[in-house]
Amino acid sequence: MTDRLSPERRRYLMQQVRSKNTRPEKAVRSLLHSIGYRFRLHRKDLPGTPDIVFPSRRLVLFVHGCFWHGHGCRIGQLPKSRLDYWSPKIEANRARDQRKEAALAAEGWRVAVVWQCELSDLGALEARLRNILDPS
């Protein structure tokens, strides 16, 4: 199946895909802030430049888009076209995520992932985040 968009238009649209300060990331940050947690953003001195960092808790949060990071939910399903491109791309993203998590764990950091689809139930996400941040 051919792309309905011109190469210039497709390039422009792909350039608009953000890697930092995405809508899901901002929603998680807003939720964390509203329940009283303070954090640091995008620490470049840590492996993988985590989205949200809690230095005193030695905890990092990655906010993953379900499609780009290959989550098993409905949003994370691969497109039906160009599987020869998308399958290796998403698998490479997943492998990179695992390497980043392993490197952080080796440095003594706890790692948690918040998936984009979890934002559909903010109450459950808040409870999960509280449990991660203050395990008792």
From Swiss-Prot:
It is an enzyme of class 3 (hydrolase). InterPro entries: DNA_mismatch_endonuc_vsr (IPR004603), Restrct_endonuc-II-like (IPR011335). One of its GO terms (biological process) is DNA restriction-modification system. Disulfide bonds: none annotated. Its EC number is 3.1.-.-. Signal peptide: none annotated. Keywords: DNA damage, DNA repair, Endonuclease, Hydrolase, Nuclease, Restriction system. The keyword DNA repair applies. One of its GO terms (molecular function) is endonuclease activity. May nick XorII sequences that contain T/G mispairs resulting from m5C-deamination. If unrepaired, these mismatches can lead to C-to-T transition mutations. The very short patch (VSP) repair process counteracts the mutagenic process by repairing the mismatches in favor of the G-containing strand. This enzyme is an endonuclease that nicks double-stranded DNA within the sequence CGATCG (C-methylation site unknown) next to the thymidine residue that is mismatched to 2'-deoxyguanosine. The incision is mismatch-dependent and strand-specific. Belongs to the Vsr family. This is Type II nicking enzyme V.XorIIP. It comes from Xanthomonas oryzae pv. oryzae (strain KACC10331 / KXO85). The gene is vsr.
